[in-house]
Amino acid sequence: MINFKDSQTKENLMRAFAGESQARNRYNFAASVAKKQNLAIIQDLFNYTANQEQAHAKQFMDKLKDFSGEEICISASYPAEVENNTLTLLRLAQEHESAEHDEIYKSFAETAKNEGFNDIAILFENIASIEKTHSERFKRYGDML
């Protein structure tokens, strides 16, 4: 097992925390757009999902408690979405949630397993399955719009 301090898993947890935190804000912004377009149900969907993303971010941060007060340097890219169209925002959210499920968190889980952090691998796998649900829900609501 690799020392957690020197692991890729530590950095992946921070990437996941950053990604979930940004998703939360993007969904809060999207909820405001939906509100302006009088789409209350879509507004609620974005707010509900934003709260779930916050819960995911907390779970990832909790795994980093041993590094409290330290900085963890990561390199990653995140989407910049400045849109005023609710359908476009739903489609973008669907794509991002799908990528988290299909690629990102599966890869992070595999790395965690390879490094010997099975509990963290399970966390990534569990959250990946939730992200799949998010993607499917965003698609369903987008299709209805």
Give the residues covered by each predicted segment.
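Non-heme di-metal
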Residues: M1-L145
